[in-house]
């Protein structure tokens, strides 16, 4: 597979990637009760910076205490959190790789008990629950919306200017707060923040503009899950026009890249259920164009990743492929794919174990990778 375009460079903002395999943002619940990354988080990311020039996208990270709707997920608002992340960033950079922080606000998808324990309400664009029988959020006021935008801006500053991240990814996917404003089944407002395509886009676009003003356009990307029905999304009648408007405005604003979660959320060996036939997001990749990178995520394996880069988008040199679960169990994933080595199986039971390194640090490198590293060390 070493001849595949997966192993050609990709200019990504100010980062020159040496291959197009990207670590997916994945919640792992390995932060302490105050949202500070635990010490072994540094080791986890360093393990996956196994080849110089690798791009790592971190797990979703709360922009503020009120935006943190789950226990043991990290934040980026406190000095302790910033310091914890800076250790991770410095270690990844020392290995010659790059790391971007995903910025996150949960909105109505939060666990109510976590919010109440800190004195916060469940909130969203409108008073519409994720599904019938679920808790109903309170609609954010205009002042609160602007305050949340400010939280995103401060979090981006903390990440890029203080912790040293190469950039930030705005989490506009999977039914979280930005997505809750974008899509009409959730957003039933009639003010400047809802009621039409342009107004539903306003929250995400204003966040993007102001974050770019704070840290620069080469340091800002956006993730979207256009076809996903997760957490009450993906059922709107004007879905394509809504996302077309949003993506075209993002392109005009000048973000560094677009990250799209595909409609296929299953492993490549089990493609039985697809939420939409456009499994490689060709509808929205065409809208975005070829000038800047597009990251594609959604159940890719070695062969399907090669296929999407070398055949589906053979005329698009700025496509990156995002790996999640396979990257958990194969910290040397880029090396394995390049050399055609078999992948280790992952264990779902250990994905989410707070305060534990089980299933987090204990997947070994391949013997071939270890041998190659020893050779390089001797040559150095």
Swiss-Prot record:
| Keywords, comma-separated and alphabetical | Alkaloid metabolism, Flavoprotein, FMN, NADP
Q: Which Pfam families match?
A: Oxidored_FMN
For substrate, which residues are the binding ones? 171, 174, 352
Record flagged with keyword Membrane:
no
* InterPro entries xref list: Aldolase_TIM, OxRdtase_FMN_N, Oye-like
GO BP term (any one) = alkaloid metabolic process
Instruction: Report the superkingdom from the record.
Output: Eukaryota
What induces this one? Strongly expressed in planta but not expressed in axenic culture.
Binding residues annotated for FMN, in chain numbering: 25-27, 60, 102, 171, 223, 299, 324-325
Single GO MF annotation: FMN binding
Q: Which family does it belong to?
A: Belongs to the NADH:flavin oxidoreductase/NADH oxidase family.
Describe the function of this protein. Answer: Probable inactive dehydrogenase; part of the gene cluster that mediates the biosynthesis of fungal ergot alkaloid ergovaline, the predominant ergopeptine product in E.festucae var. lolii. DmaW catalyzes the first step of ergot alkaloid biosynthesis by condensing dimethylallyl diphosphate (DMAP) and tryptophan to form 4-dimethylallyl-L-tryptophan. The second step is catalyzed by the methyltransferase easF that methylates 4-dimethylallyl-L-tryptophan in the presence of S-adenosyl-L-methionine, resulting in the formation of 4-dimethylallyl-L-abrine.
User: Can you name this protein?
Assistant: Probable inactive reductase easA
The record's gene field reads: easA
């Amino acid at each position: 597979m070493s001849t595949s375009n997966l192993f050609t460079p990709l200019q990504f903002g100010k980062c020159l990637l040496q291959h197009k395999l990207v670590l997916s943002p994945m919640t792992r619940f390995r932060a302490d009760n105050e949202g500070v990354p635990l010490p072994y988080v540094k080791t986890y990311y360093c393990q996956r910076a196994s080849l110089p020039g690798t791009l790592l996208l971190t797990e979703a990270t709360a922009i503020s205490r009120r935006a943190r709707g789950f226990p043991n997920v990290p934040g980026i608002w406190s000095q302790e959190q910033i310091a914890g992340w800076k250790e991770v960033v410095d270690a990844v950079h020392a290995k010659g790789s790059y790391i971007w922080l995903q910025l996150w606000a949960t909105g109505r998808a939060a666990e109510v008990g976590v919010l109440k324990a800190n004195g916060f309400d469940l909130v969203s664009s409108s008073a519409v629950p994720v599904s019938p029988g679920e808790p109903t959020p309170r609609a954010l006021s205009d002042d609160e919306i602007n305050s949340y935008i400010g939280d995103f801006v401060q979090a981006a500053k903390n990440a890029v200017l203080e912790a040293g991240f190469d950039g930030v990814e705005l989490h506009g996917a999977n039914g979280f707060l930005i997505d809750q404003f974008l899509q009409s089944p959730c957003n039933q407002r009639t003010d400047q923040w809802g009621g039409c395509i342009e107004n539903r886009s306003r929250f995400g676009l204003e966040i993007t503009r102001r974050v770019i003003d704070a840290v620069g356009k080469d340091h800002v990307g956006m993730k979207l899950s256009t076809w996903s029905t997760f957490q009450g999304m993906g059922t709107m009648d004007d879905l394509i026009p809504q996302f077309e408007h949003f993506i075209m405005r993002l392109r005009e604003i000048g973000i560094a890249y677009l990250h799209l979660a595909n409609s296929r959320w299953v492993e490549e060996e089990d493609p039985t259920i697809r939420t939409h036939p456009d499994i490689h997001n060709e509808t929205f990749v065409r809208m975005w164009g070829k000038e800047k990178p597009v990251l594609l995520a959604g159940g890719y394996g070695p062969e399907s990743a090669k296929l999407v880069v070398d055949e589906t988008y053979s005329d698009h040199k700025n496509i990156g492929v995002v790996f999640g679960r396979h990257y958990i169990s194969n910290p040397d994933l880029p090396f394995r794919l390049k050399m055609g080595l078999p992948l280790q199986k992952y264990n779902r039971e250990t994905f989410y174990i707070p305060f534990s390194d089980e299933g987090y640090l204990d997947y070994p490198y391949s013997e071939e990778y270890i041998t190659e590293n020893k050779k390089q060390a001797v040559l150095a």
